[in-house]
Amino acid sequence: MSKKYGGQISFDPPARLEKDQVVAKVVQLKGSALFMVVENNGQELLVEMPPKYRNKIWVRRNGFVIVDKSEFLEKDNKIDGTILYVVQSPLKNWKKQIYWPKEFADESLNQNDSEESSSSEEEYDSD
């Protein structure tokens, strides 16, 4: 008797996503374990972090997560899904996957470039 899969932090992407799993971008923290995320089509979802990982995984704004919507499809509920994966750097492994949305690939490239340039500026400013 196996337990239902909760969530995890992962540097390695899964080979494929199931039917009701989507890649989403974290837009806003709504509570201790609730996050507002946006799919690549612009649809906003309210998702929750599984209780097992609430104090162990840090989700940052403008980061990416894999959301499972299957559990909440038939329920009349405010919550639209559960976070399965928290995408961590390096993003290049994730962006190579066929399920990674093109809209997010462009955004994540720009985000990484700006982070690298700001960190290099800080190094020069400290002299």
From Swiss-Prot:
Residues modified as Phosphotyrosine: Y124
InterPro entries: EIF1AD (IPR039294), NA-bd_OB-fold (IPR012340), RNA-binding_domain_S1_IF1 (IPR006196), TIF_eIF-1A (IPR001253)
Domain of life: Eukaryota
Subcellular location: Cytoplasm; Nucleus
SMART domains (alphabetical): eIF1a (SM00652)
GO molecular function: RNA binding; translation initiation factor activity
Transmembrane segments: none
Gene3D superfamilies: Nucleic acid-binding proteins (2.40.50.140)
Keyword list, A-Z: Cytoplasm, Nucleus, Phosphoprotein, RNA-binding
SUPFAM superfamilies: Nucleic acid-binding proteins
Modified residues (Phosphoserine): S126
One of the GO biological process terms: cytoplasmic translational initiation
Pfam families (UniProt xref): eIF-1a
Annotated protein name in UniProt: S1-like domain-containing protein C146.08c
Naturally occurring in which organism (per UniProt): Schizosaccharomyces pombe (strain 972 / ATCC 24843)
